[in-house]
Swiss-Prot record:
Pfam families: Chorismate_synt
Protein's name in the database: Chorismate synthase
Alphabetized UniProt keyword annotations: Amino-acid biosynthesis, Aromatic amino acid biosynthesis, FAD, Flavoprotein, FMN, Lyase, NADP
Highest taxon of source: Bacteria
A single BP term in Gene Ontology: aromatic amino acid family biosynthetic process
Entry-linked SUPFAM superfamilies: Chorismate synthase, AroC
Protein function: This reaction introduces a second double bond into the aromatic ring system.
Phylogenetic lineage: Bacteria, Pseudomonadati, Pseudomonadota, Gammaproteobacteria, Pasteurellales
Pathway: Metabolic intermediate biosynthesis; chorismate biosynthesis; chorismate from D-erythrose 4-phosphate and phosphoenolpyruvate: step 7/7
Gene designation: aroC
Length: 360
């Protein structure tokens, strides 16, 4: 099965399934002599892992990462870095009732049609559990970006359902309280929105339903010049990486779809000797980073694994009514914050290495 790798010079390949023995990844291209241990990776995995909040799935996984290769005497060697996380809390019996049926809104049908076989246990390879290894690789990329270039990649939850954060609390990036973002269960920068999110998730769990979400990712201190026009534009690669995350249905760079109602006189980011006057473009012009903060917004669909009965068909194309059992997130966007950060960091590091190779 192709499509398991991302990047050219900094390349990440993941493997493993939701209910398999383990998840893993191979990282190629990280420069040598960077100090690295499991302790550098684990904090981001802890932000993503299940079973740590009443707002997310009840599946409990330690998500303890182990470095298998590419590190000697506490430093990267420049060779392939192998990482692995063992699965411990699989409950495959929850999925026996769907082994011959297709869950509406899931990848069951398309995987079966494409490959003629599928791992029905928790979605197999299509499960969001696969993203644990992206987060692990992204933590390494974030460390290198921060130490070598001062680049910070951070994200926050901006909306669940119809409930949005107060836009004034993020209008000035420099004033975002990132400590608060990382210390509340919703990764939300707006303290007034947290209790509203709490009430919404409680209601969804009682109803057995789910809701979509919107996240914002911000990369600061990105140098000018990253991006390879025309087909490897930085914004194109970021969109590709973010769209590859499970349940993501839309990506916006900068003002995104709001540009439709803007005039050119409003949208253009005017320049002065002291810098740009605005950042409607989201830090990317002509597919190349402008030196401004890179801003992306991503939309997550509501998960289809819900207790509300739905119509579907079985392997024999017979009509059925299905209720999805198991342990699932009422809003997958909550745990997606470190995943989004990871994908942006992976793309930025790849483009930084490509920039250095081409332009010195």
């Amino acid at each position: 099965m192709a499509g398991n790798s991302i990047g050219q010079l900094f390349k990440v390949t993941t493997f493993g399934e939701s209910h398999g023995l383990a998840l893993g990844c191979i990282i190629d291209g990280l420069p040598p002599n960077m100090a690295l241990s499991e302790a550098d990776i684990q904090p981001d995995l802890d932000r993503r892992k299940p079973g740590t909040s009443r707002y997310t799935t009840a599946r409990r996984e330690a998500d303890q990462v182990h470095i298998l290769s590419g590190v000697f005497a506490g430093k990267t060697t420049g060779t392939s870095i192998g990482l692995i996380i063992k699965n411990n809390d699989q409950r495959s019996s929850d999925y026996r009732e769907i082994m011959d049926v297709f869950r509406p809104g899931h990848a069951d049908y398309t995987y079966q049609q494409k490959y003629g076989i599928r791992d029905y246990r928790g979605g197999g390879r299509s499960s969001a559990r696969e993203t644990a290894m992206r987060v692990a690789a992204g933590a390494i990329a974030k460390k290198y970006l921060s130490e070598q270039f001062g680049i910070q990649v951070r994200a926050y939850l901006a909306q669940i359902g119809t409930i949005k954060i107060d836009p004034t609390c993020v209008a000035d990036i420099a004033q975002i309280d990132w400590k608060y973002v990382n210390n509340n269960p919703f990764f939300c920068p707006d303290a007034t929105a947290v209790p509203k999110f709490d009430e919404l998730i409680r209601c969804l769990k009682k109803e057995g339903d789910s809701m979509g979400a919107k996240l914002t990712v911000i990369a600061e201190n990105v140098p000018t010049g990253l991006g390879e026009p025309v087909f490897d534009r930085l914004d194109a690669d970021l969109a590709h990486a973010l769209m590859s995350i499970n349940a993501v249905k839309a990506v916006e760079i900068g003002d995104g779809f709001a540009v439709v109602s803007q005039k050119g006189s409003q949208h253009r980011d005017q320049m002065t000797p002291n810098g740009f006057l605005s950042n409607h473009a989201g830090g990317i012009l002509g597919g190349i980073s402008s030196g401004q903060p890179i801003i992306a917004h991503i939309a997550f669909k509501p998960t289809s694994s819900i207790m509300v009965p739905g119509k579907s068909v079985n392997m024999d194309n017979q009509a059925i009514e299905l209720v999805t059992k198991g342990r699932h997130d009422p809003c997958v966007g909550i745990r997606a914050v470190p995943i989004a950060e990871a994908m942006v960091a992976i793309v930025l590091l790849d483009h930084l290495l490509r920039f250095k190779a081409q332009c010195g």
